Amino acid sequence: MAFEFPAAYRFADSHEYAHLDGELIRVGISAFAVDQLGDIVFVDLPDVGASLDKGTSFGSVESVKAVEDMYAPIAGEVVERNEAVLASPEELQNDPHGAGWLLVVRPSDPAQLETLLDSATYSAKVNAG
């Protein structure tokens, strides 16, 4: 199965995405990661106001297969979290790049986006294996 990813998104090697939306960054996990996890049963996210450091764990996602940490693709402050995903984890499964987003972050250094993989590079990486 070949995965397609939104062209404007940037991706971490650990499969989280960052999407610039005005001055804020929408964060989630890729459709590839969701597919690898299987049926998602629980999502744990930080509270609004929490500080994220790039590359450090910010929460976890639990599926029937495993519990996996999620890592911040960018540093900043959490300004919103997706309560719908917390209440119904299947939202993440159904639309990871849309309604299944996880956090909105006010970045401390927006230039960190440039350190992430562009959509084409990430797509080639996950579709090659």
UniProtKB/Swiss-Prot annotation:
Transmembrane segments: none annotated. This is Glycine cleavage system H protein. Disulfide bonds: none annotated. Gene3D superfamilies: 2.40.50.100. The modification N6-lipoyllysine is found at residue 65. The glycine cleavage system is composed of four proteins: P, T, L and H. GO terms for biological process: glycine decarboxylation via glycine cleavage system. NCBIfam families: gcvH (TIGR00527), PRK01202.1 (NF002270). SUPFAM superfamilies: Single hybrid motif (SSF51230). Residues 24-106 form the Lipoyl-binding domain. Its cofactor is (R)-lipoate. InterPro entries: 2-oxoA_DH_lipoyl-BS (IPR003016), Biotin_lipoyl (IPR000089), GCV_H (IPR002930), GCV_H/Fam206 (IPR033753), GCV_H_sub (IPR017453), Single_hybrid_motif (IPR011053). Pfam families: GCV_H. Belongs to the GcvH family. Binds 1 lipoyl cofactor covalently. The glycine cleavage system catalyzes the degradation of glycine. The H protein shuttles the methylamine group of glycine from the P protein to the T protein. Keywords: Lipoyl. It comes from the Bacteria. One of its GO terms (cellular component) is glycine cleavage complex. It comes from Synechococcus sp. (strain CC9902).
